[in-house]
Regions:
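Secretory targeting and sorting signals
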Residues: 1-31
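Short, well-ordered surface patches within globular domains
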Residues: 33-91, 138-144
Length: 164
């Protein structure tokens, strides 16, 4: 009887633990791809909203710039670096005549939606002369955005490239 009780208690603890891990164990890092995708979409939308406010044409997604931005964001997150990519790399690999880049390192904030992070990032870029210049340049026609979380989970690394 005692063995049955111990087994039953052990099973309840195991099932409870699995349920807890299933509910709580999905951190933003584990749920990262969908959160990151929503943030990337939000960054493009926020950038276009801001560009429209200043009578600039909106930019459309470009798969080459997108892949390059995603790869660079992952590289920066994994290596704990915060530097711009050589623009010649983007110009050549994506066959473009003009390109600019904005990067950001944004602290993770529990409960903050991907859309809120995206809007806040664009708002902060608008407060910086160089980032603002890139964001409002009349030259770009296309955009690529990449987002990656640092291994410690403390930051989102954001890369936005716009080109012509």
């Amino acid at each position: 009887m005692r063995t049955v009780q111990h087994t039953l208690v052990a099973l309840i603890v195991m099932v409870s633990s699995l349920a807890f891990v299933g509910l709580v164990g999905v951190s933003p890092a584990a749920a990262g791809p969908s959160y990151a995708n929503r943030m990337e979409s939000g960054l493009t939308a926020s950038t276009n909203r801001r560009r429209s406010q200043y009578d600039r044409r909106t930019v459309r997604a470009n798969s080459c710039l997108d892949r390059m931005a995603e790869a660079w964001a992952r590289h920066l997150a994994e290596t704990n670096q915060f530097v711009h990519r050589r623009m010649s790399t983007l110009l050549n690999r994506c066959n473009r005549s003009y390109v600019n880049e904005n990067i950001a390192k944004y602290p993770t904030r529990p409960g903050m939606s991907a859309t809120e992070v995206a809007r806040d990032t664009v708002r902060l870029w608008m407060r910086s002369d160089g980032h603002r210049h890139n964001l409002l340049s009349r030259k770009p026609r296309v955009i690529g955005v990449g987002v990656a979380r640092t291994p410690d989970g403390d930051y989102w690394v954001i890369v936005e490239n716009m080109a012509r």
